[in-house]
């Protein structure tokens, strides 16, 4: 095959690995997003799946060229760029109430960030970190609010009883 068409040659082991990483990223983001859909939040499974997939795609984009070997600092800059850009997307999910005191959407913004981070870890092939991060995110999204509410009630009740004793 002529040299200018050599990029069409398939290396199925590498392509299978890339596909596995992209699927892992998409499914990790979708798992977090499904939780958001269940709780009727504005950013859900499709959005977070796409955010995670996009992050993995950016990380993997350099790996398809055998001639290119990225230095650790170059990968670090790509990750920093992803996370900064995702911060702007997450900021769009944060809303203030009419009186300006209530803030809504912070957890949704954080889920956009974790979906991006899961995409980065999947893109890098850090399988344990991708799975552990997905499970931890789901744990926090599922049980975080009830635990937070109980602890808040517990500590505000203790604070109130201490103030009453004074």
Describe each PLM feature range.
Residues 56, 60-61, 81-93, 113-126, ...:
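Mid-bilayer segments of alpha-helical transmembrane spans in multi-pass integral membrane proteins
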Residues 104-114:
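Short hydrophobic alpha-helical membrane-embedded segments
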Residues 29-41, 89-102, 146-149:
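C-terminal ends of transmembrane helices
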Residues 1-78, 124-125, 130, 150, ...:
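Alpha-helical transmembrane segments and their membrane-interface boundaries
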Residues 136-146:
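Alpha-helical transmembrane segments and their membrane-interface exit regions
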Residues 106, 128-133:
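Hydrophobic alpha-helical membrane segments of integral membrane proteins
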Residues 3, 7, 117, 135-137:
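Transmembrane helix-bundle core of multi-pass membrane transporters
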């Amino acid at each position: 095959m002529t040299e200018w068409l050599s990029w069409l040659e398939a290396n199925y082991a590498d392509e299978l690995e890339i596909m596995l990483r992209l699927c892992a990223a998409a499914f990790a983001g979708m798992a977090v997003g499904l939780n958001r859909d269940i709780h009727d939040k504005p950013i859900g499974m499709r959005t977070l799946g796409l955010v995670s997939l996009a992050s993995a795609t950016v990380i993997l984009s350099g790996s398809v060229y055998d001639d290119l070997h990225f230095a650790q600092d170059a990968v670090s800059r790509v990750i920093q760029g992803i996370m900064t850009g995702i911060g702007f997307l997450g900021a769009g999910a944060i809303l203030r109430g009419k009186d300006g005191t209530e803030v809504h959407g912070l957890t949704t913004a954080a889920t956009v960030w974790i979906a991006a981070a899961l995409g980065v870890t999947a893109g890098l092939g850090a399988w344990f970190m991708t799975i552990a991060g997905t499970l931890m995110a789901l744990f926090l999204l599922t049980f975080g609010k009830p635990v937070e509410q109980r602890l808040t009630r517990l500590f505000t009740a203790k604070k109130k009883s201490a103030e009453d004793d004074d």
